[in-house]
C-alpha cells in the first residue's frame, strides 16, 4: 500500500505536467498577473537577487547540516553554532536550531530521508486539507495545506516554539530565520505563519527554502505573501523535479519569492517576482533529481550524501 501511494503520486505528477507543461521561451511581459485556473501567474521581469550572496550561502550550509546524521552540539557551520536537535528523520523530520552571527536563531529542517519509510510516506501524503486554525489562525479564508507536511509540522510545533523562545532569550536575539531542503523547505514554509504568531520578541529576519515543493493552495500562497513582508524566498536549481510538484493543476500554488539558478549548479541566479513567474523555473520543462540535491550559491546541499559537516561557498 505504501509503495502504491508513492507510485500513484509520481504518476499523477508526470501525467499532469506532460499535459499542461509551460513551453520554453515565454516572452509575454504584461499583464503582471494573469489567472491560471483562477490562480495568479506573474509575468514580471527577473531581477538581481535582493540580498548579498554570502547570506544565501550561509542559509544553504545550514539547510545541508540538518541532513547530516553525524553531528554534535556546538559544531560550527560558517558563522553559526548548533544549539539543539530534535527528531529521528523518519517519522519526525530532524529540526536543528543554530545561533548565527548574521541570521540570528536559525531553524533548519532536514529533507526527506529516502532510507526511511515513514519519511517517504509523509512526503507522499499529497492531498490538500484545510489548515489547522489552532496553528494558523491568520491564514486567509479557504487556505489549504499538503496534508503530510501539515501533520509533520504539528508534531514538532510545540517543542519548536518552546526551544525557539528559550534560545532567543538566552542569546538576547531578536532575529529568527527559517530554512530547509525539500521536505524541510516545506516545513520552513509552514512554520512561517506559526512562528510569527508566537514570537515574544523580534521578528522573522528571512526564510530561505531550497528545493521547495508546492505546499498549499492559492489562499495559502497569499497568506505567505502577506505575512512574510517580502522576506520569504525559495530557491529552484535548474530542472529540479521537486519545485515543480505537486502540479498547479491539482490546486497547488507557490508563493512569491522564487530565485532560480539556471543552468543548475552554476553561478547564474536571478530573482523572479510574484507568484509562479513564467520567466522562472516554470518556463522549462524538465525533471531532474540530481538538480534537487545540487549546488546552491556555490554551496552543496546534497542531503545524506553531501558535506558533513556542511561547508559554506566552497563548491
Swiss-Prot record:
GO terms for cellular component: extracellular region. GO terms for biological process: lipid catabolic process. Belongs to the AB hydrolase superfamily. Lipase family. Class 3 subfamily. It is found in: Secreted. Disulfide bonds join 68-308. It is an enzyme of class 3 (hydrolase). Keywords: Disulfide bond, Glycoprotein, Hydrolase, Lipid degradation, Lipid metabolism, Metal-binding, Secreted, Signal. One of its GO terms (molecular function) is metal ion binding. The active site is at residues 182, 240, 292. It catalyses: a monoacylglycerol + H2O = glycerol + a fatty acid + H(+); a diacylglycerol + H2O = a monoacylglycerol + a fatty acid + H(+). Its EC number is 3.1.1.-. Secreted lipase involved in Dandruff and seborrheic dermatitis (D/SD) probably via lipase-mediated breakdown of sebaceous lipids and release of irritating free fatty acids. Shows activity against monoglyceride and diglyceride substrates and generates free oleic acid from the substrates mono- and diolein. Able to cleave the oleic acid from both the 1 and the 2 position of the glycerol backbone as 1,2 isomers of diolein were converted into oleic acid and glycerol. This is Secreted mono- and diacylglycerol lipase LIP2. It comes from Malassezia restricta (Seborrheic dermatitis infection agent). Residues 1-21 form the signal peptide. Glycans are attached at residues 74, 265.
Amino acid at each position: 500500500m505504501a509503495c502504491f501511494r508513492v507510485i500513484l503520486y509520481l504518476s499523477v505528477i508526470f501525467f499532469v505536467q506532460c499535459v499542461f507543461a509551460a513551453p520554453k521561451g515565454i516572452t509575454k511581459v504584461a499583464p503582471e498577473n494573469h489567472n491560471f485556473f483562477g490562480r495568479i501567474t506573474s509575468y514580471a521581469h527577473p531581477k538581481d537577487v535582493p540580498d548579498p550572496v554570502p547570506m544565501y550561502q550561509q542559509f544553504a550550509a545550514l539547510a545541508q547540516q540538518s541532513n547530516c546524521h553525524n553531528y554534535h552540539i556546538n559544531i560550527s557551520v560558517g558563522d553559526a553554532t548548533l544549539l539543539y536537535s530534535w527528531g529521528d528523520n523518519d517519522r519526525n523530520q530532524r529540526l536543528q536550531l543554530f545561533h548565527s552571527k548574521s541570521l540570528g536563531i536559525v531553524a533548519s529542517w532536514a529533507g526527506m530521508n529516502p532510507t526511511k519509510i515513514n519519511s517517504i510516506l509523509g512526503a507522499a501524503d499529497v492531498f490538500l486539507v484545510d489548515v489547522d486554525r489552532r496553528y494558523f489562525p491568520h491564514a486567509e479564508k479557504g487556505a489549504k495545506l499538503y496534508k503530510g507536511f501539515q501533520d509533520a509540522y504539528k508534531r514538532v510545533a510545540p517543542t519548536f516554539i518552546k526551544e525557539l523562545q528559550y534560545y532567543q532569550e538566552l542569546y538576547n536575539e531578536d532575529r529568527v530565520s527559517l530554512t530547509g531542503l525539500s521536505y524541510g523547505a516545506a516545513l520552513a514554509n509552514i512554520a512561517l505563519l506559526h512562528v510569527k504568531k508566537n514570537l515574544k520578541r523580534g521578528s522573522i529576519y528571512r526564510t530561505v527554502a531550497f528545493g521547495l515543493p508546492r505546499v498549499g493552495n492559492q489562499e495559502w500562497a497569499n497568506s505567505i505573501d502577506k505575512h512574510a513582508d517580502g522576506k520569504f524566498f525559495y530557491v529552484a536549481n535548474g530542472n529540479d523535479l521537486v519545485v515543480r510538484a505537486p502540479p498547479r493543476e491539482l490546486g497547488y500554488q507557490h508563493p512569491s519569492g522564487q530565485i532560480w539558478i539556471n543552468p543548475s549548479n552554476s553561478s547564474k541566479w536571478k530573482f523572479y517576482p510574484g507568484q509562479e513567474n513564467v520567466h522562472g523555473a516554470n518556463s522549462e520543462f524538465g525533471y531532474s533529481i540530481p538538480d534537487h540535491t545540487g549546488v546552491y550559491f556555490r554551496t552543496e546541499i546534497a542531503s545524506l550524501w553531501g558535506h558533513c559537516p556542511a561547508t559554506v561557498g566552497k563548491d
